[in-house]
Each structure stands twice: as structure tokens, then as C-alpha cells.
A protein has these predicted regions:
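Active-site segment of metal-dependent pyrophosphate-handling enzymes
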Residues: 43, 53, 77, 85-122
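Nudix hydrolase/Nudix homology domain
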Residues: 23, 60, 72, 99-151
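Active-site acidic-Proline motif in GNAT/NAT acetyltransferases
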Residues: 68-74
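A sequence-level detector of short linear motifs
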Residues: 15-18, 48, 151
Length: 151
């Protein structure tokens, strides 16, 4: 299997180059785009997935419902739909872009495209995760600072 290639972007999201996953996650701070999907049910609860213990970044922590990298040559909406199908087996058509922001960590620099959707059907997380469930806002507030959520 060949290594994944990600687009490198400027702060506006324009593609300015490309790099491997390893290069982007090595502390180089190369700005690359990612997609996140926040799934709410009609009760106002937020779905979080539990990251696999096999992940190299934030293993075993509760995270946004869908989060993934944009492949080189792929547009943002296509990446979001692909990641949502891969991780949860659902169709995210009709989701809404909420915000675009930069995320910095000691290992990487991401341009995050954050989307939301209201979804009340069954969700079957892939084996790429260690499960998932809907959380009330009180549960999320109680979990903040406990070391179980991703930043």
C-alpha cells in the first residue's frame, strides 16, 4: 500500500503543494485540510466516536463523529462524504458547513472544515473506531478536563 498524499493549502484553503501523511504529521507544521462532521440528534445530543487504540494520534479518546484527511486531488465535500461512509456507513448529504479554522498541535497544522447534520437513524461505526454513542451536553461538559476527549 502506498503512503497517503495530502494537499498542502494556504490559510484560505487554496492548494499550494502536496506532502505525504508522514511529512504532515512529523512536526513539520505543513498546513493540510481535514473534514469534521458533528452529528446531532433531534434531542440535541452530539454523537462522538471512540478513537481506536491503534491510532497514532489521540488513541482511545472520544472524538468528533467523523474526522479525516482530504486526499490530494479530492475536493472538500467529496472527502466529507467519503469519510462519513467509511467511518459510520451513513450518507451525510445535506450537511451544513459551520466553520473553517486552523488547528495547531505539536505534530501537525490542520485547516479544519467543520460541518454539522441532524441525524436520527441508526449509526454503525466501522471497525476503524472503538464504537460511538450520542452524548448529552451535560455529559460532554462533565467529561471536559478528564482526559477522555480529544482537544
Amino acid at each position: 500500500m502506498s503512503e497517503e498524499i495530502f494537499p498542502l493549502v494556504n490559510e484560505q484553503g487554496d492548494v499550494v503543494g502536496k506532502a505525504t501523511r508522514r511529512e504532515c504529521h512529523s512536526g513539520s507544521k505543513l498546513l493540510h485540510p481535514v473534514v469534521h462532521l458533528h452529528i446531532f440528534n433531534t434531542a440535541g445530543e452530539l454523537y462522538l466516536q471512540k478513537r481506536s487504540m491503534k491510532k497514532d494520534i489521540q488513541p482511545g479518546k472520544w472524538d468528533t463523529a467523523v474526522g479525516g484527511h482530504v486526499d490530494f486531488g479530492e475536493d472538500i465535500p467529496t472527502a466529507l462524504l467519503r469519510e462519513t461512509r467509511e467511518e459510520l456507513g451513513i450518507n451525510a448529504e445535506g450537511c451544513e458547513l459551520v466553520q473553517m479554522y486552523e488547528f495547531h498541535s505539536d505534530r501537525e497544522h490542520e485547516l479544519v472544515y467543520a460541518y454539522k447534520i441532524v441525524y436520527d437513524k441508526d449509526i454503525t461505526p466501522s471497525e476503524e473506531t472503538d464504537g460511538g454513542r450520542f452524548w448529552s451536553m451535560q455529559e460532554i461538559n462533565d467529561a471536559i478536563g478528564q482526559g477522555i476527549l480529544t482537544p
